[in-house]
Amino acid sequence: MTITAQQALQRTIEHREIFFDEMLSLMRQIMAGEVSPVMTAAILTGLRVKKETIGEITAAATVMRELATKVVVPPPHDHFIDVVGTGGDGSHTFNISTATIFVTAAAGARVAKHGNRSVSSKSGSADALEALGANIMLTPEQVAECVQATGIGFMFAPSHHSAMKNVAPVRREMGVRTIFNILGPLTNPAGAPNTLLGVFHPDLVGILVRVMERLGANHVLVVHGLDGMDEVSLGAATMVGELKDGEVSEYEIHPEDYGLAMVGSRNLRVEDADESRRVLVGALENQPGPAREIVIFNAGVALYAANLVDSIEAGIVRARELVASGAARAKLDEYVQFTRKFGGA
């Protein structure tokens, strides 16, 4: 079922839903550059004001996945995971999700991380990996080779979503959050079936776990720290939406339930990508402090999402062992060295 841009705009103004098939059609038009910048901005604003529905987000993500340049990672996919955040939480912490992938891969998971440069933070995942010396400008085949060899592949979002070129100038000029801010984490080009997904707003926990269910995901934990972080937090309880065995559940976890001390996110803030690198490496080198503890907490949840352990508690125990033994730091070095064989810094 098709819908014109004008009809879609009218629908959003009236706070009515754009149905799934209509949203598929609309997104294909927008991504093909068939909708003018003015109408695109108006529709994106209308969706934001009325609040995007599960169906609208699912349809938009479906189109983004269709158009993405894929990374083909051979099975098995039981322990294949993305650890990703929407960003936009304004916390300016070091790159926690990037540190987490090295612990997760050291445990035997395969991680296909989908990320970008910083928009609002001091250091996006692409910035963090480049600061660590990794070459992130790889072809899809090279990314797949990285995953096979090291257990980690990084997919630089602009390299895999070329259709975004028709939307990027509009988003840049608008300068406000739109549906595209939440589509990135839903559109992993390698199709990782398991995900630890951090979100910037509590309302997104229940919404995005149900979107991931509709998109056919396997095991997903969508998290939001009640102190505002788009990570599993040490500073407050963390809301969790979990998809497992086809069932969705929602609950809260608290650091003290796992024997972890509470620490405010201000203790994890950094000024730039270089400081983020130093803090990240220190955490993986088992230097005591809040950075190490939050990486262990997030990695524990990621190991559970990757089906390597049966509980978050067991994941935290395993993550602590991997950091203490040096395995996580060794995985970082292995990954960086492997990417550099393709050229780059």
Swiss-Prot record:
Is-annotated flag, keyword Magnesium? yes
GO biological-process terms attached to the record: L-tryptophan biosynthetic process
Instruction: Enumerate the residues binding 5-phospho-alpha-D-ribose 1-diphosphate.
Output: 85, 88-89, 93, 95-98, 113-121, 125
Per UniProt, Mg(2+) 1 binds at 97, 231
EC no.? 2.4.2.18
A cellular component term from Gene Ontology for this protein is: cytosol
Record keyword Cell inner membrane present: no
Q: Which residues are anthranilate 2-binding?
A: 171
Question: Where is anthranilate 1 annotated to bind?
Answer: 85, 116
**Which residues does the record give as Mg(2+) 2 binding sites?**
230-231
Cofactor list: Mg(2+)
For this chain, the family text in UniProt reads:
Belongs to the anthranilate phosphoribosyltransferase family.
Mind telling me what this protein is named?
Anthranilate phosphoribosyltransferase
Tell me the organism.
Answer: Azoarcus sp. (strain BH72)
